């Protein structure tokens, strides 16, 4: 089976639709940005992904769906630093430092998420900014954004 488009996301399904048999494809965060890849489901079925559009995969994306079954993307958990600045100044300080390092960062309502890096952990300690180190699933890929200093 070759998957060429994302059908939808389980977050947008009705409760009735969520009752279908779910087969999962477990991906590493770095695989979420790959448009072309061969994967194996948790049922041992091999499928090819060749997305027509340049979009990143996300947690819960439906790759295939029929009346009774669906194949859904799940994301393996990874080592994450969960940064919880207490003030706007702390947020600005750490955001500036992470930006200077060109580190991909994700944001929630109250947290900044980065992949674990001992240098960032040392920086957070030295700045006194609260953080935790967690094994956590993230919904989207940590993506590097290209830039230049022209």
Curated annotation (Swiss-Prot):
Instruction: Tell me the InterPro entries matching this sequence.
Output: UreE (IPR012406), UreE_C_dom (IPR007864), UreE_N (IPR004029), UreE_N_sf (IPR036118)
Query: SMART domains from the entry?
Result: UreE_N
Q: Which Cys-Cys disulfides exist here?
A: none
The UniProt function text for this chain reads: Involved in urease metallocenter assembly. Binds nickel. Probably functions as a nickel donor during metallocenter assembly.
Q: Which GO terms describe its molecular function?
A: nickel cation binding; unfolded protein binding
Q: Which organism is it from?
A: Staphylococcus carnosus (strain TM300)
One GO location term (cellular component)? cytoplasm
Name the GO terms of the biological process aspect.
protein folding; protein-containing complex assembly; urea metabolic process
Give its localization: Cytoplasm
Q: Which NCBIfam families match?
A: PRK13261.2-1
Q: Which CDD domains match?
A: UreE
Name recorded for this polypeptide: Urease accessory protein UreE
Cited Pfam families: UreE_C, UreE_N
Q: Which Gene3D superfamilies match?
A: Urease metallochaperone UreE, N-terminal domain, UreE, C-terminal domain
Give the UniProt family note: Belongs to the UreE family.
Q: Which UniProt keywords apply?
A: Chaperone, Cytoplasm, Nickel
């Amino acid at each position: 089976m070759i998957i060429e488009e994302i059908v939808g996301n389980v977050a947008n399904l009705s409760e009735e639709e969520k009752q279908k048999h779910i087969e999962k494809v477990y991906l590493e965060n770095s695989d979420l940005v790959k448009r072309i890849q061969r994967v194996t489901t948790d049922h041992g079925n091999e499928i090819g992904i060749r997305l027509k559009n340049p979009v990143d995969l996300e947690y819960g994306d439906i790759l295939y769906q029929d009346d009774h079954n669906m194949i859904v993307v799940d994301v393996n958990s990874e080592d994450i630093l969960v940064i919880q600045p207490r003030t706007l100044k702390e947020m600005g300080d750490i955001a500036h430092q992470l930006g200077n390092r060109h580190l991909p960062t994700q944001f929630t309502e109250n947290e900044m998420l980065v992949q674990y890096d001992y240098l960032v952990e040392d920086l957070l300690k030295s700045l006194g900014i609260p953080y935790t180190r967690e094994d956590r699933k993230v919904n989207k890929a940590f993506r590097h954004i290209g830039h230049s200093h022209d």
